[in-house]
Amino acid sequence: MSGAGEQLIRLNEVMARLRVECPWDREQTHVSLLTHLIEEACEVVDAVEEGTDADLCEELGDLLLQVYFHARIAQDEGRFTIDDVAQGIADKLIRRHPHVFGDGEVPEDLRGVWERRKRQEKGRTSSLEGIAQSLSALARTQKVISRARAH
């Protein structure tokens, strides 16, 4: 197994070349890729629930491609890079896990602490703010119930 860094760099290079040399890849936008993003996320769910390790590995790769594709589009537009995406999520995980990366103790209500930190970071006053509008009705309802239970 090679280091993740090597293969992620390779994927970034492949994506950069595709955006230059492949007409289909070059034409894509964040909006045109939304259907693919949702489809790949659903295929990951299917692989977790019913697939093999090989299926899950493949579907996670397809989902990772979507992340890199969107980041490459943003980079081509001068907005942000895949490094910005990775730095942002790593920083967020560290901030939200002081019991791991700081001197905080493990709280009994880890989920509640996570949600409170998230609200503070986003400047939200209600636990119901920030629920994705594009979620299905069922998923949105589940999210509302989950957040309500956390309070």
Regions found by a protein language model. Give the residues of each.
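Flexible "arm" and connector segments at domain edges
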Residues: 1-59, 65-151
